[in-house]
Amino acid sequence: ALTLLQKGHKVEILDFGKSDSIPLKKSKTFKSVKSDAQFSANFFYGADLEGINEPNDNEVFKYPVRRPSISTVNMYDNEEDTRQFQPIFSNYKGGLALAWGANSIEFNQDDMIGFEYTKQDIEAAYKKAYKRFHVSGPVKDDDLSSLVNESHKFNSSHDMCSADDAFKRYAMFKYKFFPKNKNVLIGQSRLAIDNRLNSNQKCNSCGLCIWGCPSNSIYTPLNTLKDCQKFNNFKYTNNIKVSHFISNNGIIEYVADTSGARYKVDNVILAAGAINSAIILLKSLKENKITDKNLIRTAGLLDTEVIKIPYLSLSKMFKPFTTDKIQFNGLMAMVKNRNKDFPSWTQVELLSLGSLIYQ
C-alpha cells in the first residue's frame, strides 16, 4: 500500500481492524512488572488467571492472554477445513505480525526453484523493505552470511542474551575442531528491530517482547499504516468483514462485505492471511458461478508437520536467570537438506524460552 501511495495511486484498505492491547510505558521492564505482585498476576495471566497452565497442559509455548491479536478462533466461523492442523488467526489491525515475529529472511537463488523469476529480479525490493523495517543482524559476517541476506549489509546489530552467546560459542567451537561437519550452521537472527544508535525506538532489552514492545522497536505493519495515513490519497476503513468479490466478465468490480454493502474497486489486492484469503477467494468463485464445489482441498504448507527439538544448555544451569530476552529468537540456524527436490538449506528457528531452553 505504501509503495502504491508513493507512486501517486489512490489506495483504500478494508479491514476488520480491532486494536490490540496497548504496550506498557517505555520505562517498564520484565523485572519491574514482576516486582508488583498484584499487577504482574493480571498482566501475565489475565484478570481471571486464565493464562496459568493446567497440570495436564502439554504445550511448550503459549502466547500471553493479554495479546488478543493472537487467537485460535476465526471470525469466519470455521468455514474452512482445518481438521489436519490448528491454525492461528488474527482479527486485529496489523494482523499476525503484531506478535508473530520480526524474522526478516530473504530468498536466495536456491530458494527460487520453480519460480519464473530470479533472486536478482526482487533484490531491489528487498533492499527497500530492509531499509523501511530497520532490519538488524550481524555487522560482521557470520557462518550464515553466504546463505541468508547475502545482498544486505547490516549497519546495526541486536543484543543477544547470555544463553544465545553460549549457544553460538559452542557451535563455533565445534566447527573449529570438526570443520567438515557443517550440516547445521548457527548465527545471529536477522530481525526487524530498530536498533540504530540514534533511534529513539532503540531496543533497551526490557524482556517484554512477547507482551508488546514498550519501545516500539519491533517492526509491525502498524508502523507502515501510520506512514500510509500521511497521504491524502489514502483511506482506511475498519469494522469491515469482507465476504467475496463480485466480477463481470472475469473483472472484479465490487468487494462485498457480510452486511451486504458493496465497494467499487478498480484493482484488488487480497491480503487477509493464508486461510481467510482462501476463504474469500473460494466464496468469490462460488458466488460468481465459476465453481459449484463446496470444498476444494489442496496440500500446502500448513499440512506439513512441525518438528520440535528441545535443547538444554547445561552450561547455564548454575548461572543467574536473565530476563533481558524472554521468549524471543536471537539466533537462527540453517540445516543442510539432503533431498534434491528441495532447496539445499532449510531455515530453523531457535526460540529462546528463558536462559535454559531452546525449541
Please annotate each region the language model reported.
Residues 5-6, 10-36, 215, 231, ...:
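Glycine-rich loop(s) and the adjacent beta-strand/alpha-helix scaffold that form part
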Residues 1-3:
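Conserved beta-strand->loop/alpha-helix structural units within folded catalytic cores of enzymes
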Residues 37, 41-48, 54-66, 80-82, ...:
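Conserved redox-cofactor binding core of oxidoreductases
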Residues 104-110, 285-290:
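A glycine- and small-aliphatic-rich helix-loop capping segment at beta-alpha/alpha-beta transitions
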Residues 65-89, 96, 258, 294-359:
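FAD cofactor-binding and catalytic pocket of flavoenzymes
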Residues 94-98, 103, 110, 154, ...:
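Flavin (FAD/FMN)-binding glycine-rich loop and adjacent Rossmann-like elements that form
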Residues 110-118:
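Short, polar/flexible loop-turn hinges at active-site or ligand-entry regions and domain interfaces
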